[in-house]
Amino acid sequence: MGLSDGEWQLVLNVWGKVEADVPSHGQEVLISLFKGHPETLEKFDKFKHLKSEDEMKASEELKKHGVTVLTALGGILKKKGHHEAELKPLAQSHATKHKIPVKYLEFISDAIVHVLQKKHPGDFGADAQGAMKKALELFRNDMAAKYKELGFQG
């Protein structure tokens, strides 16, 4: 299920575009997640009061959390699948503290792909999309394995 060097290069090329403006990408990813899957909002005490897209766009806390999410994911993607050290604390917190189901990781993966398609159509063609989907699936599968080790059936 691993990615080829070429696929990792496609992933990291488009991720460079994300890193050029992490706050707006993170905000758009979370808004896309919450609009597409409103049930995910219930996992975020800080955001569950945000009902409209305008309220979400105006929230500095939401923007800050988007930066946190995409910064952590970027660190994992740059490891090209060798992300054990980065994944362990993330899985620990998401399984034991936040209780985030693996399904929600799939939802946010879809939101990431959607935002990248929208913001970077010229740099995120079919090959890059396929590579990113594979990289995010690898991340989710490894998170699910860690969840299982921790006894979380998310």
Swiss-Prot record:
PROSITE patterns: GLOBIN. It catalyses: Fe(III)-heme b-[protein] + nitric oxide + H2O = Fe(II)-heme b-[protein] + nitrite + 2 H(+); H2O2 + AH2 = A + 2 H2O. Its EC number is 1.7.-.-, 1.11.1.-. The modification Phosphoserine is found at residue 4. InterPro entries: Globin, Globin-like_sf, Myoglobin. Nitrite binds at residue 65. The keyword Cell inner membrane does not apply. It holds the Pfam family Globin. GO terms for cellular component: extracellular exosome; sarcoplasm. GO terms for molecular function: heme binding; metal ion binding; nitrite reductase activity; oxygen binding; oxygen carrier activity; peroxidase activity. Heme b binds at residue 94. Residues 2-148 form the Globin domain. The modification Phosphothreonine is found at residue 68. Keywords: Cytoplasm, Heme, Iron, Metal-binding, Muscle protein, Oxidoreductase, Oxygen transport, Phosphoprotein, Transport. Its main location: cytoplasm. It is an enzyme of class 1 (oxidoreductase). O2 binds at residue 65. The keyword Cell membrane does not apply. GO terms for biological process: removal of superoxide radicals. It is found in: Cytoplasm, Sarcoplasm. Monomeric heme protein which primary function is to store oxygen and facilitate its diffusion within muscle tissues. Reversibly binds oxygen through a pentacoordinated heme iron and enables its timely and efficient release as needed during periods of heightened demand. Depending on the oxidative conditions of tissues and cells, and in addition to its ability to bind oxygen, it also has a nitrite reductase activity whereby it regulates the production of bioactive nitric oxide. PANTHER family: MYOGLOBIN. Monomeric. This is Myoglobin.
